[in-house]
Amino acid sequence: PLADAKDVDAAMRAAHAAFPAWRALPVAERAALLRKAGDLMQQRVYDIAAALTLEVGKNRMEALGEAQETVDFFHHYADDFEQHAGFDHPLPNDPIDGVVSRNRSVMRPYGAWVVIAPFNFPFALAGGPVAAALVTGNTVVFKSATDTPWSGRLLAEVLRDAGFSKGTFN
């Protein structure tokens, strides 16, 4: 069945309700969950690729490439955020002589993100923004393309099985 306005409202409420606890979780814990999701995707890469082949009509190698790319997104964002301590660091001084900067580069969570996946790369172009949003401390409301709902369901199952808390991914 298709989602209606009530379903969307419920997903947004769940994402907003989960946000305070999720954003408070240390970067290392969010990264560990993201890495676990990537590991689960890796274990399921052939099943995910089979679904992509059936849904989108990709050949086996293209589908495997998309599934593996999504695994790589999850591992990359987890590693990147851990290595850079959540991306909170001072920026260098302005290149103009005598100008001292007091700027910081901070990636911080803002709330619920909406991620809408296209039909032609439904797993990778969902997984990339979802991984970035989650590791940063945002929650996600996801909508798969109408023609490719199976890959979205597989992504949701991976995140559930990895242990993401209720309302973090909707």
Name each region found by the language model.
Residues 10, 29-36, 43, 47, ...:
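Generic recognition of stable, solvent-exposed alpha-helical segments in well-folded globular domains
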Residues 1-54, 76:
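Short, structured beta/alpha segment
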Residues 50-68:
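Flexible, acidic loop-helix segments that line cofactor/substrate-binding pockets
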